[in-house]
């Protein structure tokens, strides 16, 4: 028996439950298995650009995207209401009271409580105790100077720094000065404290633009941890060494919170002093969350299948599962189910829009499509080519149905903000398409002006739609003011994307890319350009953290969504574009660990 939405706390009315069959007739769908062998690709007739303006405008880009890796897999995964009920009952009745008592225990010092909170965060169960954690941290932050003065343990200070900053408290970095020698450098003796070094490495990712000491800490710890893990006579235990390797590959701050939990549970289970209650709670919670994710993927796969765009528009990237993975980065807690569904639907349909502009449409077709988006009128598309009508109708109807769904909750205005962002995306897509058709390489600054508009801020806007516990007008006004945090998010995405998709996109003739623009403008090698762009990238990350810690115009839940926006790029674009080509790389394994395999209890 398949679990229904109402069985485990989702909204009674399904979001966008049906699609007009006359608008989206069913044809055929890819039915690929989970085989890791790439399936046969669709081949579109592509005409290369020539020097003739007419030919230039009528040419189609050359792009062949691999089909979906997952097909209809999640539609066949069985789910039972009893599973949800059993997990929920044990979590609520047995686990939560025990852990709540741990947090409130008078035997624990402030430092011990903070370390417990850190453990709960890493295990993915801190969200169950938001009120208790806020009370503990609020009280401790008021006594921070005294706490720091009495503490000289590197791991503890670094843990406090990570906890306070990720929870929105601006703990100063001067606490790390005590670990420096007379020469102003971090003491070499610290390298003997392996766990302290690892925790300092994680904390070092949370610096702001003026905190040079955090850059020093990152360089100091990374070099020594890399040496430690590459040394065959290393003193770290095998499971700790593996944990360090994982951190060096992808720091916690750059990972999805639920993936941090998945990996940390495996590590924590091998710790000799692990707490059985916390370990069991973490396993139950992960499996409970996983059931929600599978149900949501079933709903989304059904929705995507009914739209049937993968067969009608075979040039697009059919990536509903990968898009959902990105939405999961924004919020993993079960209560945000509706938010994940909304973000996935909008992002997937915007991906269709993007691929039409980048990978198939001629310049006149792209121009007419973008113009239609500016007018935002379904009755004004009769003159569009048939396939362009399908693209516009798909985006328009998806947003209209979401608006109808959210109107009773008083969330229409934020949906309109999302529509405005899509219109802005269209203008940027058109500008970049013109460059591509003309093989024009703009200056780096010109490119970034439009490239930043196709980055991450719109993703944040989509995530606000279902944040019913936050004031809509307050959120909209802040977002529309174009805060520095949004610019920094765009910069992080744009640079990471352009560096790690460079080879793939240049092979498709997409010469107007940030890395290529920088190389040409400054007359430097690829390696030199990457080095300079990474400096810009690093500074953007610092701005994100600074804005997260200092912004007061919106509540912390909104800022957390923004902080989380950048997390999936370290999976999609870690070394290459795994979103576009998911058959090669680690992304498919990560998705499998989240959505296919539960943790044995």
Swiss-Prot record:
Family named by the database record: Belongs to the terpene synthase family. Tpsa subfamily.
GO molecular function term, any single one: terpene synthase activity
Keyword vocabulary terms for this entry: Cytoplasm, Lyase, Magnesium, Manganese, Metal-binding
Short sequence motif named DDXXD motif, residue ranges: 354-358
Protein name: Terpenoid synthase 17
Single GO biological process annotation from the record: diterpenoid biosynthetic process
Pfam entry (one): Terpene_synth_C
GO cellular component labels: cytoplasm
Residues engaged in binding Mg(2+) 3: 497, 501, 505
EC numbers for this chain: 4.2.3.-
The protein's annotated pathway: Secondary metabolite biosynthesis; terpenoid biosynthesis
